[in-house]
């Protein structure tokens, strides 16, 4: 029997000055990409600022979405079902990088290369969406048909639109996923519930109420 697992591509727009500069060039609202290995967003990785309030020190990071920095962050979350083998390959690849975290730097020149459509390689350096795409390249999962060095967050938004499970405030998603986790562990609800499925259902209900359907 084939066992499948879920990974999540998370696009965010933090509203910082650096994010605003990228937005000016890309014309996209969400300009940061991350890969998550659980629906509760406890295992989220990307390339970005290592200190929340210092954009000049950046590299490989394990993101903490419950930090107040993300309280007003907009996001879109995409769920991809992959084989257990592909899941393990991606997760182990990222964990291997995390063991040498200080070796990896943010590839600012790579962003310039994307804008100019010129490949600019730098050893052990990535920008956020390049990192996410490169992790996917380790497997059979290739949602964006271009080299990782040219992949932007907007490319994920366009190619994964059918897989979107949430769009809105990241803090609201975190609240819903936390509620789902509590429900699934409750003695009154022993049957486990995937927090992402629960969150998507809650979001649909919220939208239907807003439209007057319910």
Sequence positions of predicted segments:
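Cysteine-nucleophile amide-bond enzymes
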Residues: 1-214
